[in-house]
């Protein structure tokens, strides 16, 4: 028995569905200098009227404080109702992600789950979400998108000012979370 190098570890951290599924979004994280695609999955329970109990927030593989902040920004800045609803968020394959560049993908996955609308299967999302609902620049956007394109992704949402062009890839720059949701046709109530 021998140990072999895995040339493309992305398959460990993403899953391919026959049809797009609500509540999933792919991002590109950096492990050192190496870009890795990772899928974030979210599940949002149906709202309950007159439920005075605390909503559950269950997080696996993501920073729970960043997740809580992103949920608050979704509610208050992008009008996606998650208060009073249980929210579950996880990374595929047990990957641990703490970098802010995954915020936008998390927000899109949760909004997609809350609305029951799937995101395009060939979309990646990269960007930090600020408390005012702004999408902030992150490092290594060009390297991240080159890897996503190499693995078959044709569309990307990135922060305004990223100034990245890749032939064959539609790259949309967004400055605000509500604008990002509109670009993927998931809007608040």
Predicted features along the sequence, with ranges:
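Peripheral, non-AAA+ core regions of ATP-driven protein-machinery
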Residues: 4-189
């Amino acid at each position: 028995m021998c140990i072999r190098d895995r040339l493309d570890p992305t398959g460990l951290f993403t899953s391919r569905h026959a049809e797009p599924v609500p509540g999933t979004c792919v991002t590109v994280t950096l492990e050192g200098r190496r870009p890795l695609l990772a899928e974030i999955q979210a599940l949002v329970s149906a709202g309950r009227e007159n439920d005075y109990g605390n909503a559950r927030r269950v997080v696996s593989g993501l920073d729970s404080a960043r997740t809580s902040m992103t949920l608050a920004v979704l509610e208050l800045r992008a009008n996606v109702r998650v208060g009073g609803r249980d929210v579950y968020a996880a990374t595929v394959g047990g990957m641990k992600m703490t970098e802010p560049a995954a915020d936008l993908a998390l927000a899109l996955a949760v909004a997609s789950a809350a609305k029951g609308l799937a995101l395009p299967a060939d979309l990646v999302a990269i960007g930090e979400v600020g408390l005012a609902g702004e999408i902030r620049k992150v490092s290594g956007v060009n390297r991240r998108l080159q890897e996503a394109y190499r693995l078959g992704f044709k569309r990307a949402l990135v922060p305004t000012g990223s100034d990245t062009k890749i032939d064959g890839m539609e790259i949309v720059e967004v400055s605000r979370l509500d604008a990002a949701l509109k670009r993927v046709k998931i809007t608040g109530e």
